[in-house]
Amino acid sequence: MSDFSRHIAPPGMATVYRATLDALAQYGPRRAGVAHIARLADTNRTFIYRNWADPQALIRNATLGELKHLLQLARDVPGPLLPPGCLAIRVVLRATRLLREHPVVGAMARTEPTLAHTAVLRPTTVWHETAWQWLTEHVTGHLPRGPERNTATLAVLTTALPYAFTPPLEGPEDATEQASLYRRLSTSLHLCLGLPADCPDCTATTKTWSSATGAPL
C-alpha cells in the first residue's frame, strides 16, 4: 500500500524519536533510512518529511535527546556519599557505562566507529556542546573559569570517550574485565582532575558494578 493511500493516526514525536533510535540500532547510522523509521513508528514517509526538514535533522534531534536523557540519568548515582571530586568522577563513570551499553552506540561501533567520536569531539556540533556543558556543570564546575577549567574538561572528555564509544562487540563482557576497565578509567579521571590516583573512596566503590542499574556501586 502506498504512503498516500494508507490512513493511520499520526504518532507522537516521542514515538518517532524512539523509532529513529531503534532504526539506528538495527541498521547503523548510514543505512537507517526514512522507510525504516516510518515502519518502526507505524506511520508513513509523508508524515516524516512533513515534520522534519530531512532525515539528518530527525536523527540529530533523536540522538541529541537521547544523549541528554542518558546524561541526566548519570547524575543519579547510588551508594554512599562521596567527596565532591570522587562524586564527579563516579558520575562520569556512570555516563560512560550508559553510553557504552547503549544499542545505538553498539551499532555505530560496528558500522561507523569514528562517527560518534567525531560528533562529540568537534566543537561545532550540538553533541559536543551538550557534553561540554554537562561536564562543566557537573564535573569541572568547581575549577576556576578559564584555561584551567577548559583544560580539565577537555581532558575528561577525551579520556572518557574511547571507553564510552568502544563497547564489547561480541557477547556479554566478562565481569572481571569490566571492573578492571572502569577502574582504569577511574584512575585516569582522577589524574585529569588533579586528584590522587589511589583514592581510597573511589577504589572501594569501583570494585562492584551493577548490570541492573548500569552504574558503579
Q: What is the predicted function of each stretch?
A:
Residues 1, 62, 92-100, 122, ...:
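Alpha-helical bundle regulatory/interaction domains
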Residues 1-27, 31-40, 57, 68:
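Basic, helix-initiating cap at the start of DNA-binding domains
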Residues 41-52:
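Short hydrophobic/aromatic patch on the recognition helix
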Residues 61, 74-104:
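Hydrophobic alpha-helical connector segments
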Residues 64-72:
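Short, basic, alpha-helical segments at the C-terminal edge of helix-turn-helix-like DNA-binding modules
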Residues 71, 107, 116-144, 149-154:
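Amphipathic alpha-helical packing segments from all-alpha helical-bundle domains
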Residues 74-81, 109, 113-116, 163-171:
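Secondary-structure edge/capping motif, primarily at the C-terminal ends of alpha-helices
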Residues 107, 141-189, 196-205, 209-210, ...:
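Hydrophobic/aromatic-rich alpha-helical bundle segments in the mid-to-C-terminal region
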